[in-house]
Swiss-Prot record:
A GO molecular function held by the record: S-methyl-5-thioadenosine phosphorylase activity
Pathway(s) it belongs to: Amino-acid biosynthesis; L-methionine biosynthesis via salvage pathway; S-methyl-5-thio-alpha-D-ribose 1-phosphate from S-methyl-5'-thioadenosine (phosphorylase route): step 1/1
Gene3D superfamilies (alphabetical): Nucleoside phosphorylase domain
Gene Ontology process terms (BP): L-methionine salvage from methylthioadenosine; purine ribonucleoside salvage
Organism: Aeropyrum pernix (strain ATCC 700893 / DSM 11879 / JCM 9820 / NBRC 100138 / K1)
Listed EC numbers: 2.4.2.28
Keywords: Disulfide bond, Glycosyltransferase, Purine salvage, Transferase
Phylogenetic lineage: Archaea, Thermoproteota, Thermoprotei, Desulfurococcales, Desulfurococcaceae
CDD domains listed in its UniProt record: MTAP_SsMTAPII_like_MTIP
UniProt site (Important for substrate specificity): S176, A230
PANTHER family: S-METHYL-5'-THIOADENOSINE PHOSPHORYLASE (PTHR42679:SF3)
Protein name: S-methyl-5'-thioadenosine phosphorylase
Listed transmembrane segments: none
SUPFAM superfamilies: Purine and uridine phosphorylases
Binding, substrate: M195, D219, Y220, D221
Length: 275
């Protein structure tokens, strides 16, 4: 159902999708830029394939280098397809988020376990537009195995890592109104807010990839009666990004093997999804 032609001679095992602030593929050694063609057009940028402690890693800046693609205009299907085409099994998505809780502070990390989709149906949510259709289960949308590895990595490094959280994904590119922010916080009971998780996570599930998000808290959303500015977000992001790099260096060598089937069902996501 998901037929992929891999670029000759290039393979990767772990994919890293860099979000706001993490555009630099300098996390890998022996980097090679790879252009991957997909049925859905071009990914956000060239994919840089290289090594981290002997593990082949494919790095893709979600917004393109220089942050030139806004959240609603990202070609999510091409991005996920391209990583799958390179042979990737694990995908670590790094994202900047706002906090909807006092105890999730700027500078903290969150490894979310749930999401709420508040995008506006302007994005492409599936690879299966017909005649084949699938209905993947999203009851527990993130790879629990990969989530736990990220949590363990953050703790080894002494960082504040919140091991659960509900991510509400809004359309963007604007930030929330104060009324909206209070709805996400008080009515939806969400914990963090961002603009890029959906449909990236849906597509990763359809591609049967192990996917988890490392969310970097950059600000309290405007429920806290403080306006959010791009300058504020960028200031916190600079310090967060270096710590995110250290987490990637720590966790990627531990992903050298295949996903463990007893801990993860991601590679079987389509087994019962077709009707």
């Amino acid at each position: 159902m998901f037929e992929i032609t891999r670029p000759p001679g290039v393979r990767a095992h772990v994919g890293v999708i860099g979000g706001s602030g993490l555009y630099d593929p300098g996390i890998v050694e022996n980097p090679v830029e790879v252009k991957v063609s997909t049925p859905y057009g071009n990914p956000s940028d060239f994919i840089v394939v290289g090594d981290v402690a002997g593990v082949k890693v494919a790095f893709l800046p979600r917004h393109g280098r220089g942050h030139r693609i806004p959240p609603h205009a990202i070609n999510y299907r091409a991005n996920i397809w391209a990583l799958k085409a390179l042979g990737v099994k694990w995908v670590i998505s790094v994202s900047a988020v706002g906090s909807l809780r006092e105890d999730y502070r700027p500078g903290d990390f969150v490894v979310p376990d749930q999401f709420i989709d508040m995008t506006k149906n302007r994005r492409h949510y599936t690879f299966y537009d017909g005649p084949v259709t699938v209905h993947v289960s999203m009851a527990d949308p993130f790879c629990e195995d990969l989530r736990q590895r990220l949590i363990d990595s953050g703790r080894r490094l002494g960082y504040t890592v919140h091991e659960r959280g509900t991510y509400v994904c809004i359309e963007g590119p604007r930030f929330s109104t104060r009324a909206e922010s209070r709805v996400w916080k008080d009515v939806f009971k969400a914990d963090i807010i961002g603009m890029t998780l959906v449909p990236e996570i849906n597509l990763a599930c359809e591609a049967q990839l192990c996917y988890a998000t490392l969310a970097m808290v950059t600000d309290y959303d405007v429920w806290a009666d403080r306006p959010v500015t791009a300058e504020e977000v960028e200031r916190v992001m600079i310090s967060n990004v270096e710590r995110a790099r250290r987490m990637l260096y720590d966790v990627i060598p531990k992903l050298a093997g295949e996903p463990e089937l007893e801990r993860c069902s991601c590679c079987r996501a389509l087994d019962t999804a077709a009707i």
